[in-house]
Amino acid sequence: MAVLMDTHVVVWLMGRIQQLGRESRGLIETAAGADDALISAFSFWEVAMLVQGGRLQMPQPAAGWRQRVLELGIQEIPVSGEIGILAAELENFPRDPADRIITATALTRGATLITADARILAWQGQLARLDARN
């Protein structure tokens, strides 16, 4: 089963693993072993923006952090036109562009989205999701 991790989930995975629940960790490990652990390319943009804005501290530049993520076997999914259009068309979804792109990426890939974002978890749309704290 493919899983797509929300940005904060990958941040937790890379340095705050204790914030991830046991079920989420197990699912990510299993997916990574099958080349089914995914991250939206947009998450790397989001991390770089948070670092540049001083809202997130990293032990290395964002480019080096990205390389470490990819070395774990996590597959980077580019933002396509299909993803962009679907992101814009999500009904009754929060307006945050990153959340929209990440959710649309999960939907187009048929992946379970692992997130702790309450707004995404509460959304009524057809999305397989798992609370990252579980």
Task: Give residue spans per PLM region.
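Active-site neighborhoods of divalent-metal-dependent phosphate/nucleic-acid chemistry enzymes
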Residues: 59-63, 70-118, 131
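Phosphate/NTP-binding elements of NTP-utilizing enzymes
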Residues: 47
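Generic hydrophobic alpha-helical membrane-segment signal
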Residues: 28, 34, 42, 87-88, ...
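Short glycine/serine/threonine-enriched helix-capping/active-site loop
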Residues: 39-42, 79
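Alpha-helical transmembrane segments and their juxtamembrane interfaces
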Residues: 16-18, 109, 127
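Short, well-structured N-terminal submotif of metal-dependent ribonuclease cores
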Residues: 1-39, 53-67, 71, 118, ...
